[in-house]
Every structure is written in structure tokens, then in C-alpha cells.
UniProtKB/Swiss-Prot annotation:
InterPro entries: D-ribose_pyranase, RbsD-like_sf, RbsD_FucU. GO terms for molecular function: D-ribose pyranase activity; intramolecular lyase activity; intramolecular transferase activity; monosaccharide binding. It is found in: Cytoplasm. Substrate binds at D28, H106, Y128, A129, N130. Catalyzes the interconversion of beta-pyran and beta-furan forms of D-ribose. Homodecamer. It catalyses: beta-D-ribopyranose = beta-D-ribofuranose. It comes from Vibrio cholerae serotype O1 (strain ATCC 39315 / El Tor Inaba N16961). PANTHER family: D-RIBOSE PYRANASE. This is D-ribose pyranase. Its EC number is 5.4.99.62.
Amino acid sequence: MKKSTLLNSELSYLVATLGHTDEITICDAGLPIPDEVTRIDLALTHGVPSFLETVRVILSESQIESVIVAQEFAQVSPVLHEALYRELKAEEQLCGKPIAIQYISHEAFKQRTLQSRAVVRTGECTPYANVIFQAGVVF
């Protein structure tokens, strides 16, 4: 059995095969996922797993150089948005590299998911709790 934090085999494979600038979307239970993009559905029930739990695991297993979020996330769900911001700042401190944050409209965000290697669906039911991670390099 694997000892590290990430146990889900599909997600583990995805993280292990990321190249520089590849993108992963982590989304709430309601974001439409394009048929053309691989779906990794972790949702069990409302809130399980949470958006932040999933973000933390992905951050612990991969190097992220930038993120994209919808402008609406900060406006409509400021508490969870602030929690994501704190996680990103903590990751910057841990890895010693900046993580750029880009804000776009929710409609543009949905279109951008088409560029993701995969969309990871959580059980999160907070509006606009979605983020696109762009992979960095560890060196």
C-alpha cells in the first residue's frame, strides 16, 4: 500500500504524469465538466470530500506555479476563497516559490477547463469553489 498522502489511483497517476504548465481543475459538485476532458469524480455526498481537503492533497503531491479562479468565487464565497488563498500562501512559504493567481470570469473559467488534463470533482457545495492548478517544476 502506498505510504504518501494521495491514495486515489487515478489522481496519483495524473499527478505523477504532469509536465510543466499542464493544468488540473479541482471543482465543486456543480461545475459542468466537458466530455472531452478526463473526469476524476471523488464526490461521495454533499461536502465529502471538501474542496479544501482536495486542494491540500494536490498541493502536497505536486509543484504548482500558478492558479486560475473565477472572479465570482471571491465575491460570492469569500470565506472559502480566503481559505484557498491562505493555503496557496502557505505552499509558497513551504516550497520557496511564488504561486501566481489569475482571476477570470466564471464563463471563461468553464471554457478554460477544456485545457485541463483532468477535472477533479469534489463533494463541495459552496458556489464557485473551483480552481485550475498549473504545474510548475521542482527545480
